Regions:
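Switch/communication elements of ASCE P-loop NTPase nucleotide-binding domains
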Residues: 1-151
């Protein structure tokens, strides 16, 4: 029998992952896969990496995905319902200190038409983190993250 213990970077206290929330045990395989290096470009599909995690952790996941995309030769397809994850990706694109650029990111908004057919609308992110043609009814954006996008764009 075995157990998996985790600890925060700034702590010596270890916690059994079974004693953490469900989100931690669900995100651990994603984090592990993201940190694995590949010789060739690898496509990794991730469904709702933010599931069962605190909203602040959504930003950390976005940072991890951005950091590992080029370093580990990964391309990601991410399905998410997290406005924080998307806002952080926008912030990263606007941040000139990151290697992730507007050309590296594509967003698709999927919705149904009148006949219940799935429609994919491409939404581009510009170099300042702004999104083209975003539906007004989706995601009431957090004021603090919008300020961060503006700061990083300058």
């Amino acid at each position: 029998m075995f157990s998996v213990n985790i600890r925060k970077t700034d702590s010596t206290h270890e916690i059994n992952i079974a004693d953490e929330g469900q989100g931690m045990s669900q995100v651990l395989p994603i984090v592990t896969r993201c940190c694995m290096s590949d010789d060739k470009d690898t496509l990794i599909v991730v469904e709702q990496p933010e599931l069962h995690l605190h909203p602040a952790a959504h930003e950390a996941i976005a940072d991890l995905l951005a950091d590992t995309a080029k370093v580990n030769n990964h391309r990601y397809v991410i399905e998410t319902h997290s406005k924080n994850l998307l806002l952080e990706i926008r912030s990263i694109v606007a941040n000139k200190n990151y290697s992730l650029t507007k050309d590296d990111v594509v967003v698709y908004y999927i919705h149904d038409d009148e006949e219940c057919n799935a429609i994919l609308d491409r939404i581009d992110i510009d170099e300042n983190g702004n999104m083209s043609d975003w539906p007004e009814e989706i995601f009431n954006e957090s004021f603090e993250l919008i300020k961060k996008i503006r700061r990083n764009a300058n």
